[in-house]
Amino acid sequence: MSDNTEKKTLRTVEGRVVSNKMDKTVTVLVERQVKHALYGKYIKRSTKLHAHDADNACKEGDVVRVTEIAPMSKTKNWRVVEVITRAAE
């Protein structure tokens, strides 16, 4: 066994909260731009992630930073780290 205890870098992404109807869980929409293979035009692609929100602090429209964690349920393996900007009320 080696004594190398290198820490694995956790994936962190930013996205917008689109649903907070579940208890302690929010749905975060993460958008990215990819270049089309043939035409070279940049296209928006999006992914919806379920993230753990322990304090139920996030509202719809908030921009949040989430990080990857060990699976908490079938679909939830992200955790809200911070709320970057709050939604206008």
Curated annotation (Swiss-Prot):
Gene3D superfamilies: Nucleic acid-binding proteins. GO terms for biological process: translation. One of its GO terms (molecular function) is structural constituent of ribosome. Keywords: Ribonucleoprotein, Ribosomal protein, RNA-binding, rRNA-binding. CDD domains: Ribosomal_uS17. One of its GO terms (cellular component) is cytosolic small ribosomal subunit. The keyword Ribosomal protein applies. InterPro entries: NA-bd_OB-fold, Ribosomal_uS17, Ribosomal_uS17_bact/chlr. The keyword rRNA-binding applies. PANTHER family: 40S RIBOSOMAL PROTEIN S11 FAMILY MEMBER (PTHR10744), SMALL RIBOSOMAL SUBUNIT PROTEIN US17M (PTHR10744:SF1). Part of the 30S ribosomal subunit. One of the primary rRNA binding proteins, it binds specifically to the 5'-end of 16S ribosomal RNA. This is Small ribosomal subunit protein uS17. It comes from Stenotrophomonas maltophilia (strain K279a).
